Amino acid sequence: METVYVLINVEPGALESVTKKIPEMKNVKDVAVVTGAYDILVKIEGEYITEVLTTVVRGIRQIEGVTSTETLVEVKL
């Protein structure tokens, strides 16, 4: 199982609409509105890393109102 965490920034006024669209996407396990440098934190899990990253590139980044993302890949030790 591959896990990534996506840190997302959105345009002013877009937080609610973006937050509602993300849980509908494949492999999304959790969505949280956060404080600090980013607006939203998303946990995505999938069988393969390509599958998980596709959710980011073809899903989250395409949502109107998303201005930037940073993806953190969980490392299994």
Where are these regions (language model features)?
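A compositional/biophysical signature of low hydrophobicity enriched in polar/charged and small residues
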Residues: 1-77
